[in-house]
């Protein structure tokens, strides 16, 4: 690849490429695995060379694709390097989401981890609350996207992915069905509850001002 790692367009290009890879990997005719590996190796190379100004993004990309390849421990190590270098707010938030996901996959589910998990889920819940816009409110109230598990709001999508694909199954494996059900219910209903509360407050405020 002859791309400039410091190009202003590189973030968008990487995001679009990863999204395309994800979509293709879920099809029966997927031929993208070689591309995944090439992109992973490129990301690691660029990050380790130290010439890119946005090394956090490259380490994050390498970590994400390494986990996609099934190597969670190496992915976690790469993500630690992403956490250690400077990045903008967007990439810091992306790193945090991936850290929650990797921790959920690799941690021993004991009291110490549950304390950390609670802090992480509170952080994610705050992102859900503070980034809601009218489009999200409308889609949530209509209910179709949630009912059919469609992706439409990044922060809530990540909460559902982490809980449904990793955390709840891990709790079920260790026989903690109550905690699995509690968290699954939270992930399934959290956004709707938030939107309903915000809508109720908005309506009361409007009536008060009339």
Regions found by a protein language model. Give the residues of each.
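Extracytoplasmic/secretory-pathway proteins
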Residues: 1-210
């Amino acid at each position: 690849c002859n791309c400039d790692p410091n190009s202003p367009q590189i973030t968008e290009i990487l995001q679009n490429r990863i999204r395309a890879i994800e979509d293709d990997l879920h099809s029966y005719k997927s031929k993208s695995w070689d591309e995944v590996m090439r992109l992973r190796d490129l990301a690691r190379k660029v990050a380790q060379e130290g010439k890119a100004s946005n090394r956090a993004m490259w380490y994050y990309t390498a970590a994400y694709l390494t986990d996609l390849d099934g190597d969670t421990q190496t992915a976690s190590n790469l993500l630690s390097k992403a956490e250690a270098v400077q990045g903008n707010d967007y990439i810091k938030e992306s790193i945090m989401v991936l850290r929650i996901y990797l921790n959920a996959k690799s941690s021993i589910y004991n009291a110490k981890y549950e304390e950390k998990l609670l802090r992480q889920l509170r952080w994610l819940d705050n992102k859900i609350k503070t980034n809601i816009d009218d489009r999200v409110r409308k889609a949530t109230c209509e209910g179709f996207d949630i009912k059919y598990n469609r992706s439409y709001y990044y922060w809530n999508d990540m909460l559902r992915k982490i809980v449904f694909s990793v955390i709840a199954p891990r709790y079920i494996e260790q026989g903690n069905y109550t905690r699995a059900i509690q968290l699954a219910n939270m992930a399934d209903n959290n956004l709707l509850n938030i939107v309903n509360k915000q809508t109720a407050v908005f309506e009361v405020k409007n009536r008060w001002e009339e």
